[in-house]
Amino acid sequence: SRASNGVIVITTKKGKTGRMSINYAGNFSIAPRPRYKNFNLMNSQERVQFSEDAFAAGLRYKFEPIKQINTYEGALKMFQSGEMTSDEFIKTRNYLETVNTDWLDLLTRTSFGHNHNVSVTGASDKVNYALSVGYNSNDGQEKGNSSERLTARAAVTLNMSDNIRVNLTLNGTTGTNKGFNGVDPLNYALTTSRSIAAFEEDGSYSYYRKRLEYKYNKEVESIGYNVLNELENTGSEVNTGSLKLSFDFQWKLLSWLTYQFTGGYSYNTTNSQSWALERSTAIASTYRGYDY
């Protein structure tokens, strides 16, 4: 069976006396990636027009826009300060209207998951055994998000004599979850203007300027940011494992007296790590104070 949180729960039964029995169960799941048609969000043309209307209405920004050609607000700021001619501003504005970056396509994917379980059971007059192995893999909708889990169980009953029985049970699991560090791809795709380009004309990453607050370098006002570069240079991974062993010894000394000894061993481990490399904006804004 499958638990609600996505973890495979493997249940085995005692083998029946006779020949060995092998069973397999598996399932697959697919979920389409999100698309802009599923949301009420502006395209790049609507976003530029909205900014124009807001400026014409006399609305003010919470923070003054950073001068740059990568955003309408930044280009307008350059035009107002005389760093861009009217023709240059109109050309930039018209270009930004046509960018229409599909962030959902760049940052999400069709989710695919699959579960598999193989069990082997068997028994004789002296031995009863049940073995099972399960595997679960899921690629999340956000590119770079995935999980894997492997489970195994072995249960053996030894009838050493008419009055002595030993039960051994071993359970083991291992899993890996990969994710992000400081980046929320889906939220970024749904909240970032589509008039911002992800790539330059030559195919290289396009970096727009973000406000920088770095206490050791007050002269630098902004820093470059590209979410694809950030995802390549940051991340997180959690590895888990567990092992459980139980032992049960029963000795029927008399019809009314049975000696029983029960013991067990349990081991659990979790290794969690997150990272940001030197090319990431996270490192530049936190430690370096300037672009790579």
What are the residue ranges of the model-derived segments?
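An active-site-proximal structural segment forming one wall of the substrate-binding cleft
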Residues: L257
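Outer-membrane beta-barrel initiation region
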Residues: K37, L107-T110, V120-S124
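Residues on the lipid-exposed face of transmembrane beta-strands in outer-membrane beta-barrel proteins
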Residues: T12, Y24, V118-G122, A152-L158, ...
